[in-house]
């Protein structure tokens, strides 16, 4: 079974925010998982009860200041962050992720509920699946591997991801030591 942070956040929203209005922060392509809640989506942030952050708006991919300004009047609302990663590599381009917006929201005293590695809710729900063999896969030592280490689950590090330059310069052993991380397996890439 493959279990994602998006699935974990969807379950949480069904249990806790089912009839609440939300403002979606992220590109339209990220919204497919949350179609169940489409009737509760509002286009004006002022009309929302909470904030659902899955990424950055396509027209504001490089400007975290834009989000601080947008969110500054809404710090009393909870933000649900569906991906705690701060950055992601898409091909050769490094981009901000939803976690960067969430951190910006916290910097202005907003409250964020994170779903995804390394935060416990995604593991608690995944471990409930009755699958006793859990392998956490990812390219980020700060989130993917740290979460696996905290939960004492096996992990597979994708070395061709965000740490590829560090690994190429320092060796995998030294990078793991620098991040105080342990892995069970590693490989360059993962193809579906």
Residues covered by each model-derived region:
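Asp-based, Mg2+/Mn2+-dependent phosphohydrolase catalytic module
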Residues: 3, 7-192
